[in-house]
A protein has these predicted regions:
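Short, low-complexity, intrinsically disordered N-terminal peptides in bacterial proteins
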Residues: 1-3, 149-154
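Long, amphipathic alpha-helical stalk/connector segments used for oligomerization, subunit docking
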Residues: 72-73
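N-terminal interaction modules that seed assembly of large macromolecular complexes
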Residues: 18-60
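A charged, amphipathic interaction segment
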Residues: 77-151
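Short amphipathic alpha-helical segments and their helix-coil junctions
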Residues: 3-24
């Protein structure tokens, strides 16, 4: 199964979206990057440190230029705005949300292209999540990563 299909299925599992959003909002983690890490672990892929750094660089570029601005706009448009009718505001918000999802899909495609071929048995998701989170940020939010790993489907 490709990364996009795996990520959509995983994100829909109970508890995964909440765990992902907590990592994003409370620990400034990149959800597509985390899902890539968990997918790599689940499919027996072992990205080396250089690949992890390249994945983080790719995610940072998408995050800074595309995802964060789209997410900010979507969140601004969530609440009613004086002098803007709710219908058009919601229409624009839904379009921004669709663009954000499309951008995440493009990021996942770029990350999948960086992943090495499967070379080993699957390993626990927490191993891949922690390895990537260590490169992504100065602080590794281990309890939140464990929560995500525990929620991911086996």
């Amino acid at each position: 199964m490709g990364l996009w299909d795996w990520a959509v299925a995983a994100y829909g599992a109970p508890g995964v979206s909440d765990a992902c959003l907590a990592l994003q909002d409370n620990h400034e983690q990149n959800v597509p990057l985390l899902l890539w890490s968990a997918w790599a672990a689940a499919t027996g892929r072992r990205p080396d440190e250089e690949t992890l750094e390249a994945a983080c660089d790719t995610a940072r570029a998408w995050d800074g230029v595309v995802l964060t601005p789209l997410r900010a706009m979507r969140r601004i448009l969530k609440a009613p705005v004086p002098d803007i009718d709710d219908g058009p505001r919601e229409t624009i918000r839904n379009r921004v949300k669709a663009l954000e999802l499309e951008a995440e899909r493009h990021l996942l495609q770029a990350l999948e292209a960086l992943a090495p071929d499967p070379s080993a048995p699957p390993r626990p998701a927490i191993d891949g999540l922690a390895a990537t989170a260590r490169i992504w940020a100065a602080v590794t939010p281990r309890p939140a990563l464990i929560r995500l790993a525990d929620a991911l489907p086996a």
